[in-house]
Amino acid sequence: MENDSAQHVRFQNLQEDQMTFNQVFEHIVAFMRSRPAGNYRLIVGTDSQIHPQKTIFITGIVIRNKGKGVWACIRKVTVPRKMLQLHERISYETSLSEEIVSLFTEERKRQLIDIVLPHIYQGASFSMEGHIDIGAGKKNKTRKFVQEMVTRLEAIGVEPKIKPDAFVA
């Protein structure tokens, strides 16, 4: 049974449209069960694009098995105005990622960990990352927001990654 916050959220990829979060989670479980001794990274990240009358946000969920493939999907959110303030846009990107991360409840995370757990001594692993579309370089306009956004993701229990390591955002 889906919780209330997950019922309105829809995802898509090249194979399926209008997936619920439960369907997404089942795809992730099936992907991991196909090779339970894998090195898995569950990654959530959001990027945005400003258009003349709107700003489009794309949140990606990627489950990656190092050297063995990925399964991924996206969620698209449209804000009906140009979000020109950089801090507002970066903060909203982070909020959308936080929303999706929150759908991975402790019970769901435990279910994913339990897939790889019997294979830990053979090198299996599982981690969860939040990718943020910001960088710490001296010329990067987003560098002043790094600490704030990193702290937000750490607070919800995911490992934050920034550019150039944040490839999902």
Model features per residue range: what roles?
Residues 169:
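Extended, alpha-helix-rich binding/interface surfaces that flank or overlap catalytic cores
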Residues 79-116:
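Acidic helix/loop or adjacent segment enriched in Glu/Asp that either coordinates divalent metal
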Residues 104-137:
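Amphipathic protein-protein interaction modules
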Residues 16, 71-82, 86, 150-154:
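Argonaute/PIWI-family RNA-guided endonuclease scaffold
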Residues 49-51, 69, 135-141:
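Short acidic, S/G/P-rich loop/turn micro-motifs used as interaction or catalytic elements
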Residues 124-166:
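Short, low-complexity, polybasic intrinsically disordered segments
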Residues 1-45, 49-50:
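Basic, amphipathic N-terminal segments that precede the first structured/catalytic domain
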Residues 44-45, 51-75:
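Acidic, metal-ligating active-site segments
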